[in-house]
């Protein structure tokens, strides 16, 4: 008996492109569940101190 074929990529690209390969929908707030906690902590501090130059100028005067 002949050996059977183990794998082929024939027609897979055509099947994938039939309905188009779409990028995932980008949401306003991407979920952070399962992300690195150290990165998330740093991101929180970065967001807290991300202030534009002219925003707090009127409050100081």
From Swiss-Prot:
Annotated stretches, region: Disordered: 1-61
Keyword field: Phosphoprotein, Ribonucleoprotein, Ribosomal protein
Residue stretches spanning the membrane: none
Biological process, per Gene Ontology: translation
InterPro entries recorded: Ribosomal_eL29 (IPR002673)
This protein's record includes keyword Ribonucleoprotein: yes
GO cellular component: cytosolic large ribosomal subunit; nucleolus
One GO molecular-function entry: structural constituent of ribosome
Classification via Pfam families: Ribosomal_L29e
Post-translational modification Phosphoserine, affected residues: 58
SS bond list: none
Biased composition (Basic residues): 15-31
Record-stated family: Belongs to the eukaryotic ribosomal protein eL29 family.
Protein name per Swiss-Prot or TrEMBL: Large ribosomal subunit protein eL29z
Annotated organism of origin: Arabidopsis thaliana (Mouse-ear cress)
């Amino acid at each position: 008996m002949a050996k059977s074929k183990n794998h082929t990529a024939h027609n897979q690209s055509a099947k994938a492109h039939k309905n188009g390969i779409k990028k995932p929908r980008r949401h306003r707030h991407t979920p952070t569940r399962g992300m690195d906690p150290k990165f998330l902590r740093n991101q929180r501090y970065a967001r807290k101190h991300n202030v534009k130059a002219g925003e707090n100028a009127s409050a100081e005067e």
